[in-house]
């Protein structure tokens, strides 16, 4: 207590994604800036929220985390964004608060903090097609796959801060999509112009890509709603403790 008033600490929450589209509904009215190739959005109410994206893969996720930490340390972090489903029963376009993350490269397992859901997610070094999804499901017992979450989980563990993982399903197990890996640059950025030229002359992919676009939009909306509800519940619990 200082001068007869309570001093309330501001919680600094980081939200790390791969692509701006994943964050769009969440950060629509937030302040945006670009720092060294990383897109950063900030919002302040009673607490401070910082979202960032730098591309696909663990190296890009690490750069995004570093950009968020540039001003000050963070108190908790979310890995956030689109994922593929590894089972048919998972809702395409829906959001999941995962139980934990497995790194397919190292076998490491990271638990999410209290309040997380039931599904496990595996982080792959590549975009998984149907065959790879089936292999990952069998090898790790996970329901979801991404390319970044393990890096964020590891960084959170090193800093001893709470880690959460909220993901939205953009593509189901049986989705027949182009090989996205050939259009991801060394920096993790998706080379959209090359991809458009590729699919423009391959109409067999058009229906599935249209479905994926719509599912991705729904997933982004669902993630924003899930994150907002989760943070409201968490902040309410902390207020009761105080």
At which residue positions do the language-model features occur?
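Short N-terminal binding/cap micro-motifs at the start of the first secondary-structure element
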Residues: 21-26, 60
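Short, Lys/Arg-enriched N-terminal segments with co-localized hydrophobic residues
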Residues: 2-9
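Glycine-rich phosphate- or other oxyanion-binding loops that anchor nucleotides, phosphorylated ligands
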Residues: 35-238
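Small/polar loops that bind or transfer phosphate-bearing groups
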Residues: 17-18, 53
């Amino acid at each position: 207590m200082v001068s007869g008033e309570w001093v309330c600490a501001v919680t600094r929450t980081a939200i790390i994604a791969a692509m701006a589209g994943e964050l769009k509904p969440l950060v629509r009215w937030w302040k945006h800036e670009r720092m060294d190739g990383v897109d950063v959005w900030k919002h302040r109410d009673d607490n401070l929220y910082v979202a960032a994206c730098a591309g696909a893969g663990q190296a890009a996720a690490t750069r995004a985390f570093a950009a968020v930490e540039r001003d000050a340390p963070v108190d908790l972090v979310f890995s956030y964004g689109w994922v593929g489903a590894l089972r048919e029963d998972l809702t395409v376009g829906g959001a999941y608060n995962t139980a934990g993350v497995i790194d397919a490269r190292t076998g490491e397992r990271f638990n999410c903090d209290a309040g997380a859901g039931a599904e496990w997610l595996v982080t792959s070094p590549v975009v998984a097609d149907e065959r790879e999804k089936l292999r990952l499901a069998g090898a790790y017992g996970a329901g979801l796959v991404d390319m970044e979450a393990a890096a964020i989980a590891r960084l959170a563990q090193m800093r001893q801060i709470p880690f959460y993982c909220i993901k939205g399903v953009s593509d189901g197990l049986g989705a027949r999509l182009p090989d996205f890996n050939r259009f991801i640059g060394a920096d993790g950025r998706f080379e959209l112009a090359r991809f458009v030229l590729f699919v423009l002359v391959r109409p067999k992919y058009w229906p599935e890509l249209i479905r994926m676009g719509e599912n991705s939009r729904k997933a982004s909306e669902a993630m924003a709603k899930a994150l907002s509800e989760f943070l409201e519940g968490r902040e309410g619990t902390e207020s009761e403790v105080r």
